[in-house]
Amino acid sequence: VFRLQGGAFPGAPMEFTAMCAFAPYNLENVKQIGYDVLSNRPKQAAYRAPGSPMAAFAVESIIDELCNRLKLDPIDVRLKNASKEGTKASFGPKWDRIGLVECLEAAKQHPHYSAPLTNGQGRGVSSGFWFNHGGETAVTLALSEDGTAALSVGTPDIGGSRASMCQMAAEELGIPYDKVRTTIADTATLGYNEVSHGSRVTYASGLATIKAARDAVKKLCARAAKKWNIDEEAVIWEDGFAKPSGPNAGDFEPIPLAKLTKSMGRTGGPIVGHFEATPEGAGVSFATHIVDAEVDQETGRAHVVRYTVVQDAGKAIHPSYVEGQYQGGAAQGIGWALNEE
């Protein structure tokens, strides 16, 4: 039974709490009851995987307490019961390939887990789950005569998504990263985009960016085909160059993107790629954290001594930004645990 404080109005993220609570575990029988409890406090709002940290705190604390009483290794217990590919989640679907087992194994092998503790220190282990979704998304990519690209997206950057989308566009076009500029456009400029929430931005807008870049590449190939007087299907795009293929391979000198865009005013006008979609499904992620905390036995003050994050990142588009998200999430979790009621 979960009870979440909703504040003065209903709306606590009970659905997500129930989805996340037992997601890391292979359990044949699960029954969850959730209550959205009204209280004399301000209305709640979504914040950092709404509902998931509360669920993890409840379930993972119980698992650690159980392991402590039975003298069991907390990671071994989690490994024995971990969700893996083919496991049916407590809320219905079967998992595809997921990385929870790998996270647990990496955590157990990490030097932190076997490091000695001193008097007044304790060690906690926790696994957690979150997911993202698609939502309505539209992206436009316009090429300039100087060979640069202007990417317009409708999702505000709250986690480094602009840098990631610049990377994806640059990779598809075959041009340097600094040749792509991303602008956050409004609804009047671009069309409707769902808001930046639910960890959806790089997932959905990133996919749309790739598709918009490929749309632009298709048009670049058409311009090259026009120059060479061959079929569009006989042109491929490789490393930022239009190249003849098939029977025409080697017959013409490859044309770089900047040369094609420089002449686009004379070969058909602006080259703009566009894509809009509502991606379905969800990308899921699991993590395991190890924390050493120390309590001052005279004052009762607690502070974190050591913190290790192991997470299944999937494809880390911008690794340093992904690491920053790990650090930020850990810092916010520490804040919740030690500084907030």
Protein language model features and the residues they cover:
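Gly/Pro-rich active-site capping loops and adjacent beta-alpha segments
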Residues: 1-55, 117-341
